[in-house]
Amino acid sequence: MRKDIQIFLLRAFRVVIILSLVSCSTQNEASIEFERLSSIAKSINIVRDDFGVPHIYGKTDADAVFGLLYAQAEDDFPRIERNYIWAIGRLAEIEGEQAIYSDLRARLFMTTEEAKMAYASAPEWLQLLCQSFADGLNYYLASNPEVTPKLITHFEPWMPMFFFEGSIGGDIEQIPLAGIESFYGADENFVVKDTSKTAVSDFIEPKGSNGFAISGEHTASGNSMLLINPHTSFYFRGEVHVVSEEGLNAYGAVTWGQFFVYQGFNENTGWMHTSTRLDFMDEFIEDIDKI
């Protein structure tokens, strides 16, 4: 009996030792990672003006992206996280069963494996920016332990491959969820409308943003002007100024969680995005015979 107790205690002691070693190893890895991120952060300066707009300065473009994502997270981490939860197809995990078809649509568009492959095959400069995207957000979470993510506790560099279209209602959202539900039997009476054959009498006022390019011939200053009126929700994008010593100097609007200025300007040019009827993605309607 005593021998059995000794064996049991010895095994229990070994388990405790193993768990302690694993815990120490995990803590050590986390400490090393935080030191790495802290070292990068020293190369970045974030200054907020009287309106709260962040002006981000980095030595390299990658440093600037790190600072940009950190500043975005300071302003609205929940929106960043939700954008990626939606993009990678995990919305139902926080919003319930009603989001299943949204998740299915996202995963039909791209799987995690495909996103990882896209990242692995990307040019080195883009990989660096994607890594800085993840580093900036992970540094924010590590530096602000009081922030509790709903789902994503660690961001990965392949995640931006899911979320590179920064408009509202763009890309995969043009495919109606009702059609996906119908395909899987939730609503067998759903019929996809062929909008290309809409009669003039049935004309529906188009929705979307307004963008105007005005020649200097028509302005008082003689300078060309861009006017963009993005039809988004009020807080869909944040205002930023991002600068690097490699030549980046852009001011404008950034969709939460993305690392490029979506609408803005620099010393020499300006850019805007608005809605058009360009065919930038493919949709197919197939007749499926039930067996």
Please describe what each predicted stretch is.
Residues 250, 255-291:
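Compact, glycine/acidic-enriched structural inserts
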Residues 4-18:
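Sec-dependent signal peptide recognition
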Residues 236-239, 282-284:
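A short secondary-structure junction signal
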Residues 31-237, 245-247, 252-260, 278:
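Substrate-recognition/specificity elements adjacent to catalytic centers across diverse enzyme folds
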Residues 22-23:
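C-terminal motif of bacterial Sec signal peptides marking the signal peptidase cleavage site
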